[in-house]
Amino acid sequence: YQDKEAVYRRFDSYYDFDRLRGAIRGRKRGMWKYVAAAAVIALPLLVSLLLQIRQEGIFPEERMREISLLPGKSMATLTLSDGSSKLLSPENFDLMDGSKRIVNDPGGLSYQVEDTSECMETAYNEITVPRGGEYKVTLDDGTRIWVNSESYIRFPVVFHGDERRIWVSGEVFLEVTKDSERPFVVNTEKLDIKVLGTQFNVRAYPDEKCIQTTLVEGCVRVDNSLGEVAVLAPSEQLLYNAQNGKHEVREVDTELYVSWKDGVYVFVSQRLEDIMLLISKWYDVDVFYQNSTVKDIIFSGRLKRYENAETLLKV
């Protein structure tokens, strides 16, 4: 394995947004991405707020009609062990990485290795998902991974040895295939998360100060860079502060943190700024606030992840 710092130095290159978007989409971003106060238009639960904002002249009605925000979709870039890459979308194709067969279809990408004895040398693949994208991957052991917008994973094409280890930056949800003899390890820049078989969500964006590990079922052990260990039970979440190295464990409603993989955002008493942090990655927009006081407005509700934002503007 490459040392951890070397791996995460590679992550930084994937957050050169101009390069990434140019490779993935090859088109310029329109000026609609820079609409001031876009934070107050992307949620269907904000009817009363929108009316208030119109009255105060913060976001004129004629300006709202100019906005066209599309939801994200299945797209990513696959980088093979030889350094070549392929753009991924919900189309059917097969390809080979050495002797390993990779199948892509509308359900995502899957790795099929019939004879692992032919794959003794460890080869790695990488999947990079841009803003406005998502992708689903099934590893060779059957583990399923939902990769959210602006995220990256690196993994062996075939797992060898006494553990199954992958590297993650951004947000992923995992359904880990049980294997009592080979624990599954998720490496983030600051944490190692070890499981035998379970369902959990990891949110570890480089531009966010906290790393979240949310357990749905099973049991996970989390080791931080200071050597401290925490063991999570179902419905528990570990919050790790990447700035001071401290962590806390709390009980949560897991739906709030994993519903994105099922096409829904669920909010309960959340600040508008925190909500828009999620929305901005999915709709691929940059959020600006003319009035900073709206950041602290609290909302509860549900937002369909695949809803065209234009329909959300009609109040």
Where would I find each of the regions flagged by the language model?
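Compositionally biased amphipathic helical and low-complexity segments enriched in hydrophobic
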Residues: 21, 44-46
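Low-complexity, intrinsically disordered regions enriched in charged/polar residues
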Residues: 10-14, 43, 251
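Generic alpha-helical secondary structure signal
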Residues: 5, 12, 18-19, 38, ...
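Hydrophobic alpha-helical transmembrane segments of integral membrane proteins
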Residues: 37-44
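A residue-level detector for the "anchor" residue at the start of short, highly conserved motifs
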Residues: 28-35, 47-315
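Positively biased amphipathic helices and basic secretion/translocation or surface-docking motifs
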Residues: 2-33
